[in-house]
């Protein structure tokens, strides 16, 4: 009931928590115990927020044609690509923004069966355990919209240098399934 009041009072602001709730659901559904321990307390406290990154400039809603790539360097997944229409993709309301990003791994089949979901934090953990290291991602621009103007909608770029460090959520090739569970379709 409280969400109904909140969304009715200010949908622009409420969208941030709505997306974060989707990430909570996704981590609860397919996250490892370590991922749940790392992310869920931060999401639940509001210290961190979350986004979902599906759409690309050349693909629109045809997710089978996304070009964002995920390459494993032996230690980490390195993500390179661009996403558009990312609600709350960049803001200063939380200590960290956790992006769930759809990307295609090397050698993956064409179409949606070759897409995986990656966890890409804006800030990575440093040697002391604090999240202070800036990941290789950036907001290219904030969209100019006719409505819901108080909700920043970003164009995000991943991996303009070495590649944004990402962590695969769940199993390889099940990215569409996980992302759709996030939005309850």
Where are these regions (language model features)?
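Internal helix-loop-helix
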Residues: 1-37, 41, 45-46, 94-98, ...
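Gly/Pro-rich turn-and-neighbor structural signature
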Residues: 27-71, 77-78, 84
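Structured core elements
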Residues: 51-53, 67-71, 78-80, 85-87, ...
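Short Gly/Pro-enriched turn/cap motifs at secondary-structure boundaries
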Residues: 58-61, 90-92, 109, 145-152
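A short core secondary-structure module
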Residues: 76, 80-130
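Flexible, small-/acidic-enriched active-site or ligand-binding loops
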Residues: 130-157
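Long, acidic (Asp/Glu-rich), low-complexity accessory segments flanking structured domains
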Residues: 160-177
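Conserved small/polar residues in nucleotide/adenosyl-binding loops
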Residues: 183-185
